[in-house]
Structures are given as C-alpha cells and as structure tokens.
C-alpha cells in the first residue's frame, strides 16, 4: 500500500470523547509502523435553536439552545496492511462518527 493515504474524519458532540478517540487512533497507527499527520482540529459547527418559552403567548420571552459539533482530521501516510487491520478492530465510543477515505 505504498504511496497511499488514508484520511479519517471524526465528528462528535463531546470534545473529550473525540480527543480520546483520536489519541487511540494515533497510538494504534504509530504502533503498526505507519506515519500519522494530526489530529488536526477543524472548526466547530455551532447550531443555535430559538424556541418560544410559552406555548401560546409572550413572544418576547425566548430560550436559546445550541448544539456544537466538534471535528478532527487524521491523515495516515503509507499505511501497511497491518495498520488497516488494526484500525478495523479498534473499539471507539458510540458518540463518535467516523468517515474513512482511501
């Protein structure tokens, strides 16, 4: 698999969970002999929802809720077959979304 690159993109609502997952991935990849670039923190996506507090009156009283999506990017340069196998076996928390591009 010489000359190839694997790009892993992680998304999660909790920054501690995504950082620990990125640490696990980097640790696993370096143990198998491939080079790693990252984790690179990408901009946090912030969605704000505005809701009227009362069900039928008082439009001036509103409540704001926000949802933050944290993202990280990890590049694996020159992966070995052992690297790919160990990444497939890696256990990560349920709150982390993973996209892998070859």
Curated annotation (Swiss-Prot):
GO molecular function, one term: structural constituent of ribosome
The entry's keywords: Ribonucleoprotein, Ribosomal protein
Record has Lipid metabolism as a keyword: no
GO biological process assignments: translation
Family membership: Belongs to the universal ribosomal protein uS10 family.
PANTHER family: 30S RIBOSOMAL PROTEIN S10 FAMILY MEMBER
Protein name listed in UniProt: Small ribosomal subunit protein uS10
UniProt superkingdom: Bacteria
GO CC terms: ribonucleoprotein complex; ribosome
Function: Involved in the binding of tRNA to the ribosomes.
Subunit structure as annotated in this protein's UniProt entry: Part of the 30S ribosomal subunit.
SUPFAM superfamilies: Ribosomal protein S10
Membrane-spanning intervals of the chain: none
């Amino acid at each position: 698999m010489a000359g190839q690159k694997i790009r892993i993109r992680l998304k999660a609502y909790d920054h501690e969970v995504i950082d620990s997952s990125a640490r696990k991935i980097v640790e696993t990849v370096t143990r198998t002999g491939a080079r790693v670039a990252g984790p690179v923190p990408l901009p946090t996506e912030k969605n704000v929802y505005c809701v009227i507090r009362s069900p039928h009156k008082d439009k001036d009283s509103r409540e704001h809720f926000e949802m933050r999506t944290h993202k990280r990017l990890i590049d694996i340069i020159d992966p070995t077959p052992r690297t790919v196998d160990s990444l497939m076996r890696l256990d990560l928390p349920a709150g982390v979304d993973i996209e892998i591009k070859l």
